């Protein structure tokens, strides 16, 4: 299923964190905080035209921002451009 964000929005897939600590303790899903980083999967036409973000950019966003949605049994978050704090560059 394709999703096309409108306005100044982007579709982001969260980057999963390790489920095991350095000492070998496995962290259960209900004890983990959701990561505040993700990979951009789709951008609105306005953002694409302005060349601010592009697909596959790794971004950092605020803790209580965006709307969570499910597409093809995968979880994503739809964020306003202003909710994105920055891009992680390689």
Swiss-Prot record:
One of its GO terms (biological process) is chaperone cofactor-dependent protein refolding. It comes from the Bacteria. The keyword Cytoplasm applies. GO terms for cellular component: cytoplasm. The keyword Membrane does not apply. It is found in: Cytoplasm. SUPFAM superfamilies: GroES-like (SSF50129). CDD domains: cpn10 (cd00320). Keywords: Chaperone, Cytoplasm. It holds the Pfam family Cpn10. GO terms for molecular function: ATP binding; metal ion binding; protein folding chaperone; protein-folding chaperone binding; unfolded protein binding. SMART domains: Cpn10 (SM00883). Signal peptide: none annotated. Together with the chaperonin GroEL, plays an essential role in assisting protein folding. The GroEL-GroES system forms a nano-cage that allows encapsulation of the non-native substrate proteins and provides a physical environment optimized to promote and accelerate protein folding. GroES binds to the apical surface of the GroEL ring, thereby capping the opening of the GroEL channel. Heptamer of 7 subunits arranged in a ring. Interacts with the chaperonin GroEL. Belongs to the GroES chaperonin family. HAMAP family: CH10. This is Co-chaperonin GroES.
């Amino acid at each position: 299923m394709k999703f096309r964000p409108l306005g100044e929005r982007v579709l982001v897939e969260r980057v999963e964190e390790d489920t095991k600590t350095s000492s070998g303790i496995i962290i259960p899903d209900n004890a983990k905080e959701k990561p505040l980083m993700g990979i951009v999967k789709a951008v609105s036409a306005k953002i694409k035209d302005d060349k601010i973000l592009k697909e596959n950019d790794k971004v950092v966003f605020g803790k209580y921002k965006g709307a969570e949605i499910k597409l093809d049994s995968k979880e994503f978050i739809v964020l306003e451009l202003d909710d994105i704090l920055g891009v992680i560059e390689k």
